[in-house]
């Protein structure tokens, strides 16, 4: 047996009890007129974008101000001593400068021209007369210095000052070297291609001649065994 529904009086009473103290919601204006929409006077920024006073413009000014502050801080900061004496090369040319320094260092090692700081700071003899007097005097041991020993002490060979190449000249030389290498590879490829085509042409020609000889037939339409035997004998003689 299905459950019976509650009576209408209980239902109405229940809703009435629940809705006590709650105002009824009304949609729209009570007078029936529509309100006109007006923008919010409390905007997030002043002015308008058309006048150039929008939020993007203010943000740009703030970024410019921060950048100027950073520049002033960098200018006022004292330069460190290490930065004054260390060589700073641009990143895209650093490898060229380092390679040039390494080449000069190796050249000095080979020629034996690396002089110590004491030899460089030592003053040279002022007058030739003083050298003659010292050479005429004999040492207490009775040993006379040889002329070769005197020459080695006085003569100092300095490396030839070669003009350093600029980064543009080095880049130009590198470009020319790469272009020459590419041209040599291209020429070699063309030569191999011509040789391969010539070998294929000769091979096809030889095969066609052999096919013409072996494909000949007699008047009755049978293969000509005499020509085939002659061709085989000729081939054996060539190989032997």
Curated annotation (Swiss-Prot):
What subcellular locations does the record give?
A: Nucleus
Q: Which family does it belong to?
A: Belongs to the TAP26 family.
Biased region (Low complexity) positions are 131-149
Q: Name one GO cellular component term.
A: nucleus
**Biased composition range(s): Basic and acidic residues:** 171-181
- Annotated region (Disordered) at 104-181
**Could you tell me which species this protein originates from?**
Mus musculus
Q: Which purpose does this protein serve, as stated in its record?
A: Component of the transcription complexes of the pulmonary surfactant-associated protein-B (SFTPB) and -C (SFTPC). Enhances homeobox protein Nkx-2.1-activated SFTPB and SFTPC promoter activities.
InterPro entries registered for this protein in UniProt:
Fyv7/TAP26
On assembly, the entry states: Interacts with NKX2-1.
One Pfam family here: rRNA_processing
Protein name in UniProt: Thyroid transcription factor 1-associated protein 26
Keywords on record = Nucleus, Transcription, Transcription regulation
């Amino acid at each position: 047996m299905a459950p019976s529904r509650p009576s209408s009086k209980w239902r109405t009473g229940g809703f009435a009890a629940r809705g006590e103290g709650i105002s009824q919601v009304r949609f729209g204006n009570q007078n029936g007129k529509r309100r006109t929409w007006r923008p919010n006077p409390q905007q997030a920024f002043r002015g308008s974008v058309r006048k150039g006073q929008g939020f993007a413009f203010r943000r740009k000014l703030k970024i410019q101000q921060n950048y100027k502050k950073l520049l002033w801080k960098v200018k006022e900061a004292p330069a460190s001593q290490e930065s004054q004496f260390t060589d700073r090369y641009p990143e895209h040319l650093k490898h060229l400068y380092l390679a040039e320094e390494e080449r000069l260092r190796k050249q000095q090692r080979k020629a034996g021209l690396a002089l110590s700081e004491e030899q460089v700071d030592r003053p040279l003899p002022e007058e030739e007369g003083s050298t003659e007097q010292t050479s005429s005097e004999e040492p207490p041991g009775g040993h006379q210095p040889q002329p070769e020993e005197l020459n080695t002490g006085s003569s100092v060979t300095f490396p030839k000052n070669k003009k350093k190449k600029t980064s543009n000249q080095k880049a130009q030389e590198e470009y020319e070297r790469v272009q020459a290498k590419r041209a040599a590879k291209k020429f070699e490829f063309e030569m191999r291609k011509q040789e391969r085509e010539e070998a294929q042409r000769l091979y096809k020609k030889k095969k066609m001649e052999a096919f013409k000889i072996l494909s000949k037939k007699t008047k009755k339409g049978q293969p000509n065994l005499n020509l085939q035997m002659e061709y085989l004998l000729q081939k054996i003689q060539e190989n032997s």
